């Protein structure tokens, strides 16, 4: 009996092992080199332990193969992925061969029935739907429209200063949480600009908006578990769909959108004139043109909201980190800002006239890219060369991983890559040159470049102008000294958080 039991157990274990490794020869059969995958975790050894950020696993592979191949085959658990090693090939994926890599991988994991809001975000949309939605949204994010809401930016900047001054009066040995402060700023900004409502983020009794935003972005285990299941058993992706926007968060924003729409329509019906042509105004016009209900209006408005909250706050917090660590850079920036101030504020047109500020933004994005990698989906098979290896075909449906972090932290392209050196971006068209080489894609590239890039940049610059012109930024001892990323986060951030000591000038 014992022998029979052991035999059955051995057969089951053997069968399970065979199932788990059955396609690990996928890339070898196609002549594509790459590291040997490990059971369950594939080429992401920290998938389960989360001892370090996943991008470091990819960086190890990148450095192992960068001088030999343009791309190598890897596995996310059992799912084959093509890891792009050559930045020139990365640019082909985003630009010249865009039609072959049109969609983002997440599109195959999102279903409109289970996650209507995120499924209708341009990031998730595919094919003609993406093209139509982007064409609809783009006119709402022109520089002209961003300029009309700039007075809101100045108003929120004033609230930011008042909040910081209050924190300084209260005092804390841990200093100020830079991410929390930045998220208060972006939540207040975006809520007013997009919905015409106040979030009261800087008050003692904020509305639930910011907590709902935190609920939206602070769910790493949801995505890790989903990734593990669908990567280990790819067929499950047809049965299990990822829900990025939790039900309660969607319900909250649907109600909020309804309230914003009713309020604005009532104001317009009463004959109230608005000095600004804001994003809500544009969404309402689009709604009438497309005959959209509140849920559909929210799907459009969430495009503006998602691009403006978390990623913008993350970049802002890390700029303050870098300036706090680099006193000379902070002083140079303060000098540049003060030379353009008028009555304590800066004109909208002058924001683009601050080259050192722009360089600080770009260099921070290089060091702490919010989008540390892009997972593209091959939408049309294509043959590509591979340096020392033979040409091979990337088949339709293959996931193609572009590791932006690896390029931007490579000493070959950026000497002394871990150091904050804004001067890298002071050369004429430096960012454009780096982008065309494929080594710097802070906002992506090609037709699917980040649609909220200009709005986010204006927010970030305005906040930095406000803070650096009025406060000296120092790093609290609670903040780590290196640039190690927090494991398991959707958007990269310094491990342990960023804590600042601010001094009023």
UniProtKB/Swiss-Prot annotation:
Keyword terms: Endoplasmic reticulum, Heme, Iron, Membrane, Metal-binding, Microsome, Monooxygenase, Oxidoreductase
Compartment(s) of residence: Endoplasmic reticulum membrane; Microsome membrane
GO MF: heme binding; iron ion binding; monooxygenase activity; oxidoreductase activity, acting on paired donors, with incorporation or reduction of molecular oxygen
Cofactor(s) annotated in UniProt: heme
Pfam families hit by this protein: p450
Catalytic EC class: oxidoreductase
Lipid bilayer topology: Peripheral membrane protein
Ligand binding (heme): 450
GO cellular component, one term: endoplasmic reticulum membrane
Record EC number: 1.14.-.-
Transmembrane segments: none
Protein family (similarity comment): Belongs to the cytochrome P450 family.
Summary of the function given for this chain in its UniProt record: May be involved in the metabolism of insect hormones and in the breakdown of synthetic insecticides.
Name this protein carries in UniProt: Probable cytochrome P450 28a5
Native species: Drosophila melanogaster
